[in-house]
Design a protein with these regions (language model features):
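Asp-based, Mg2+/Mn2+-dependent phosphohydrolase catalytic module
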Residues: 1-82
């Protein structure tokens, strides 16, 4: 369960991924905390709620923030790295 990073470590071990080869996309702070604990880049999914405090935290702490699924899709296919 988030924010425990076990799931990310398990994926890295089983699929031989390095932290920088992964991206956690989540809409809440526990997902952010989980990604940080595993040293995995994090992106904020801001389309899932309209709570100003959550959006402010995400925008203030996350390098990648997406307001729509379309924005995230465009990022995924842009070839840019997190």
């Amino acid at each position: 369960r988030k924010p425990q990073p076990y799931a990310l470590f398990d994926i890295m071990e089983k699929l031989h991924f390095a932290p920088g080869e992964m991206l956690v996309l989540d809409d809440l702070k526990p997902g952010y905390d989980m990604a940080r604990a595993a040293n995995v880049p994090f992106a904020a999914a801001l389309w899932s709620n309209d709570i100003p405090e959550i959006e402010a935290f995400m925008r203030g702490n996350c390098g990648l923030c997406f307001k729509t699924v379309a924005q995230f899709r465009d990022y995924l296919f842009s070839g840019k790295e997190a």
